[in-house]
Amino acid sequence: MTPNKEDYLKCIYEIGMDIPKITNKEIAARMQVSPPAVTEMIKRMQSENLILKDKKKGYLLTNIGLTLVSELYRKHRLIEVFLVHHLDYTSDQIHEEAEVLEHTVSDFFVERLESMLGFPKTCPHGGTIPAKGEFLVEINNLPLSETKEAGTYLLTRVHDSFDLLKYLEKHAINIGDKLQVQQFDDFSNIFTLIHNNEELLVSLEIAKQLYVEKMN
């Protein structure tokens, strides 16, 4: 399978995690390609039983497609663990490197890498690393945006976008840190948080990319 086709599969999976309907237009926007290019790739993937079309939800991954996506995430996240723990990469440096390597390393290499790393369960961003042959199921999946209730929350996972990671680095926010939600303003869509005795005003868009666990 080509790296381009693998990227399309991951894109469809990620869109499905964010919005209820996966359209040609949304795929084109995220892949930064033309709608006709998406249409052509969609036809190929449908012929290979990687995706199917649903009237309500748009394009969906088949079990074959989901198996391939899960393996891509497994490779990607194991590589990220290796880069951080053995090559001293920072969390905002690893995503792009892993994006390249995930398409080139062999299954044998990944199995040896996983064993060497001690079979980690999560990547440096808190994302689940599925076992070989298993579907990806995120264990840390409660967005901060859905926790409007005041209280203390444990940061368990973050999206691996460069801008978000630089924002978190600026405020020294790391996986495993405690975030105290003071209030949520419905008008401005702003969360007021306390982190390490510092008050932070966090937008709803950022809160959607932070995953937490209620502590009290």
Functional labels for PLM-detected ranges:
Residues 26-29:
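A short alpha-helical element within helix-turn-helix/winged-helix DNA-binding domains
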Residues 36, 92:
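Key DNA-contact positions within bacterial/archaeal DNA-binding proteins
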Residues 42-43:
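Short, hydrophobic-biased segments on the C-terminal half of alpha helices
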Residues 46-54:
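A short, conserved structural fragment
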Residues 57-76:
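Basic, amphipathic "hinge/linker" alpha-helix immediately C-terminal to the N-terminal HTH DNA-binding motif
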Residues 102-209:
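Mid-protein regulatory/catalytic core that forms ligand/cofactor-binding pockets
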